[in-house]
């Protein structure tokens, strides 16, 4: 029989499986992409984007949350691969006590919560930019900082709520797993995350439609039309990111729920062969900076192409006015 702080037979079987090891390398690749594209995302948002100051503050907050999760998950993936390659044949594969994992897990949950709540924060900020008439730089800064502080507070307390009153007397293979007495509460929060992502999706669709409708009611004057175009472009980008996050959160939540429902029909090996791929948070974290860079660059290229076409073509007055309208729309 294994000692309490040594891995059990099914933990060892999971570590030694090729499927599990491949999943860790996939996560490591996603983590590397997150770090690389986050650098480019910060650079392009700061220098070349049309985002307002409040949007930039919240985008940077989301990028920090994504990288925080990936950094901690990096340590976990490396530890598990280290155990799989160098400890698998040892008499005792060492586990970590739940108490020792507590600080690590709290920070990890802060990163996850920051990404989910951060997307809601971005949509609220876009709502403020849409409905506040005099959304100047000072107002934008106040909104961005206020929402960012609220997100940080909620993210910090989420981990404490999940692990609240847990005796922390067990042992874990890695610190990305929840303590045994907190598993049910963690599943509840996973469902809440999915609900929030669903709310974000609905809110983003309504907000985008409202902005599009409002654009057509804006008089064809260069200043107002340009500012409205900026709001629509930035809001469309946030809505796109929200949609992607919803898809992966739905896969995570619904996938885990389905597996738990049919758990009795699966062997231990079958269950863990599938469940390892339903943890989609590393995908969400990696796709955020990648898609952010893609959307900003594609928007820029589209505008440059239109302007070049516009300046090279000789037109009548009616054609000129028609193309102007197409540029703004």
UniProtKB/Swiss-Prot annotation:
InterPro entries, A to Z: 7TM_GPCR_serpentine_rcpt_Sra, Nematode_rcpt-like_serp_alpha
Keywords: Membrane, Transmembrane, Transmembrane helix
Entry GO terms, CC: membrane
Top-level taxon of the source organism: Eukaryota
Location of this chain's protein in the cell: Membrane
Membrane topology qualifier: Multi-pass membrane protein
BP terms from Gene Ontology: detection of chemical stimulus involved in sensory perception
Membrane-spanning intervals of the chain: 25-45, 57-77, 104-124, 143-163, 187-207, 237-257, 273-293
Pfam families, alphabetized: 7TM_GPCR_Sra
GO molecular function terms attached to this record: G protein-coupled receptor activity; olfactory receptor activity
PANTHER family (UniProt xref): SERPENTINE RECEPTOR CLASS ALPHA-1-RELATED, SERPENTINE RECEPTOR CLASS ALPHA-10
Stated family: Belongs to the nematode receptor-like protein sra family.
Protein name, entry field: Serpentine receptor class alpha-7
Organism in which the protein naturally occurs: Caenorhabditis elegans
């Amino acid at each position: 029989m294994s000692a309490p702080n040594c891995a059990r037979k099914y933990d060892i079987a999971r570590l030694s499986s090729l499927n599990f090891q491949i999943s860790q390398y996939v996560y490591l690749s996603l983590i590397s992409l997150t770090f690389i594209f986050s650098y480019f995302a910060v650079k392009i948002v700061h220098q070349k984007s049309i985002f307002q100051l409040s949007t930039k503050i919240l985008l940077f907050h989301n990028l920090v949350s994504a990288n925080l999760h990936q950094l901690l998950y990096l340590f976990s993936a490396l530890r598990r691969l280290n155990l799989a390659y160098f400890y698998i044949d040892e008499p005792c594969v060492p586990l970590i006590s739940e108490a020792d994992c507590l600080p690590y897990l709290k920070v990890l949950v802060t990163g996850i919560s920051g990404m989910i709540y951060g997307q809601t924060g971005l949509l609220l900020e876009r709502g403020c930019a849409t409905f506040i008439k005099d959304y100047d730089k000072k107002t934008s800064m106040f909104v961005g900082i206020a929402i960012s502080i609220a997100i940080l507070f909620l993210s910090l307390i989420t981990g404490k709520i999940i692990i609240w009153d847990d005796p922390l007397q067990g042992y874990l293979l890695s610190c990305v797993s929840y303590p045994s007495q907190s598993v049910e509460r963690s599943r509840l929060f996973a469902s809440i995350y999915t609900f929030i992502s669903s709310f974000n999706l609905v809110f983003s669709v309504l907000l985008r439609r409202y902005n599009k409708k409002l654009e057509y009611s804006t008089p064809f004057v260069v200043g107002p039309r340009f500012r409205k175009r900026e709001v629509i472009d930035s809001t469309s980008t946030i809505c796109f990111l929200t949609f992607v996050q919803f898809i992966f959160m739905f896969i995570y939540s619904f996938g885990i729920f389905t597996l738990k429902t049919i758990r009795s029909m699966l062997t231990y090996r079958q269950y863990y062969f599938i469940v390892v791929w339903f943890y989609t948070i590393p995908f969400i974290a990696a796709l955020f900076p990648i898609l952010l860079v893609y959307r900003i660059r594609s928007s820029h290229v589209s505008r440059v192409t239109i302007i070049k076409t516009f300046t090279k073509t000789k037109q009548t007055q009616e054609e000129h006015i028609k193309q102007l309208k197409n540029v703004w729309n």
